[in-house]
C-alpha cells in the first residue's frame, strides 16, 4: 500500500526563498496552473518507459520543451481532486483538510487561517521589490486576490469568464476560445512591464482552457497543439534569463 505524505510546502520553501531572493539578482517565477488537465494527458511521459503515463494523441511540444529543459516531478501530487481546494492549498502551502476547505464551495474555517502567509506575501517578505500578478481562473472563495498579496489581477473569477464575455451572456469570440490568447498576451505584457521597470516578478497564469465546455480555434479542432505556451516561449528573448517557469495541474 502506497502512502502519500503531505507537507506544508511554504514552510519548507522559505529557506530556499531566502537564499535565492537575497542573491544579487532575484529570479522571476511564472506558474502556469492548468485546470482539469490529467496527469497523463500531455505528450510528456511522466514515468520513462511507461506508455500509459503520456498521451499519443495530444501533441504538446512546448510542454515537452519544459520537461526537457527542466525537471519532471512525477510524484508531485495535487493537493486535491477538486479545483478550489487545490488552488487554496497552493496559495497557502497547507493541505485542504488543515484549511478545512475540501469541497468546491464550503469554506468551514475561513477566519481561522486568513492570517496564514501566501506565496505572494512570502515573496514580498523576502524581497519587497517583487511585483505579483494573477490572471485567469481564481475560484477560491476563502480570500480575494488582492487580500492574498497580488498587485495585479483580473478579479476573483470562477469558471464563467472562460466561456463568456464580461457581461456573462455573450460567448467569447471564436478567435479567443477560453481566453487562451488574451490571457497569454496579458501575461506577456505584465512580464515586459516588470522587465522594463527592472522589478522581479511572480506571475500565476491560471488557464480556463481544459475546463468544460471545451473550445478551440476552428483550424485547430482536428489537432491540438499548446499554442498559448508556445506564444510565451516566442517572447522569451524579451525576458530575463533569471526566470523559473513552472507548469502544474490542479487535479492530477
What is each model feature region?
Residues 9-19:
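Bacterial N-terminal signal peptides
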Residues 1-11:
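Bacterial N-terminal signal peptides that target proteins for export
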Residues 7, 22-252:
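Formylglycine-dependent sulfatase
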Amino acid at each position: 500500500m502506497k502512502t502519500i505524505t503531505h507537507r506544508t510546502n511554504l514552510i519548507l520553501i522559505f529557506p530556499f526563498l531566502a537564499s535565492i531572493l537575497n542573491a544579487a539578482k532575484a529570479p522571476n517565477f511564472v506558474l502556469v496552473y492548468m485546470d482539469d488537465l490529467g496527469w497523463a494527458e500531455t505528450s510528456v511521459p511522466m514515468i520513462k518507459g511507461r506508455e500509459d503515463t503520456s498521451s499519443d494523441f495530444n501533441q504538446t511540444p512546448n510542454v515537452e520543451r519544459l520537461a526537457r529543459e527542466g525537471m519532471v516531478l512525477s510524484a508531485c501530487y495535487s493537493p486535491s481532486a477538486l479545483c478550489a481546494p487545490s488552488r487554496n492549498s497552493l496559495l497557502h502551502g497547507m493541505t485542504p483538510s488543515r484549511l478545512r476547505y475540501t469541497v468546491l464551495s464550503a469554506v468551514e474555517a475561513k477566519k481561522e487561517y486568513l492570517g496564514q502567509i501566501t506565496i505572494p506575501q512570502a515573496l514580498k517578505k523576502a524581497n519587497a521589490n517583487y511585483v505579483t500578478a494573477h490572471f485567469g481562473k481564481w475560484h477560491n472563495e476563502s480570500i480575494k486576490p488582492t487580500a492574498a498579496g497580488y498587485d495585479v489581477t483580473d478579479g476573483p473569477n470562477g469558471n464563467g469568464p472562460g466561456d463568456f464575455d464580461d457581461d456573462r451572456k455573450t460567448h467569447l469570440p471564436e478567435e479567443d476560445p477560453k481566453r487562451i490568447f488574451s490571457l497569454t498576451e496579458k501575461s506577456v505584457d505584465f512580464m515586459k512591464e516588470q522587465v522594463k521597470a527592472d522589478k522581479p516578478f511572480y506571475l500565476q497564469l491560471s488557464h480556463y482552457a481544459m475546463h468544460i465546455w471545451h473550445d478551440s480555434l476552428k483550424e485547430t479542432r482536428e489537432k491540438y497543439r499548446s499554442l498559448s505556451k508556445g506564444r510565451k516561449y516566442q517572447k522569451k528573448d524579451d525576458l530575463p534569463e533569471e526566470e523559473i517557469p513552472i507548469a502544474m495541474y490542479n487535479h492530477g
